[in-house]
């Protein structure tokens, strides 16, 4: 199991840095300090390894947001919890934001049906929260995908751009490097709720 975890960790970093097309199995083996045959012992190939990483990412998100949606908290608190849950899973996996941003840019080229099921369930959890809020008259019945896009985009960009923000900060007076996780999450929570409540 240790060798599998080492492969998984090395591959996650490689895919985050190079994308699926640019990722190299020899580099993954070297980073994991294993021979390449060991990769193929645990995973059928590059595609299977990549999809295992996607499954870990989106399986964790699905579990987290499903728990949020099924809680007995009011809809507005569920939205706050939903945003925080996705942020928590993304932060726990530094490879998650760059991999997902790249997949979005490439039209989900390497997303398989199992991953699509995870995505469907995540949207379903959000849709359930929105519907609950709409029934009470608190929320507008907005399309879950539109709301999700407004959550995912800023979260992924924030977590994926720490080095870029440091470079920008050196050239401008904007202290973008000092943006905190808590500030960004709170902003996304406020904007999402304002959108659902018809205030913007």
Q: What would you call each of these model-derived segments?
A:
Residues 6, 10, 14-48, 52:
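Helix-turn-helix
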Residues 48, 63, 87-131, 145-146, ...:
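Short secondary-structure transition hinges
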Residues 85-88, 92, 120-140, 153-200:
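C-terminal peripheral helix-coil segments that are non-catalytic and often amphipathic
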Residues 9, 53-81, 120, 129:
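Amphipathic alpha-helical linker/stalk segments
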Residues 66-98, 136, 144-151, 182-185:
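Hydrophobic alpha-helical connector segments
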Residues 1-2, 13, 170, 200:
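N-terminal intrinsically disordered/low-complexity leader segments
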Residues 4-5, 25, 47, 51, ...:
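Short, structured helix-loop boundary elements
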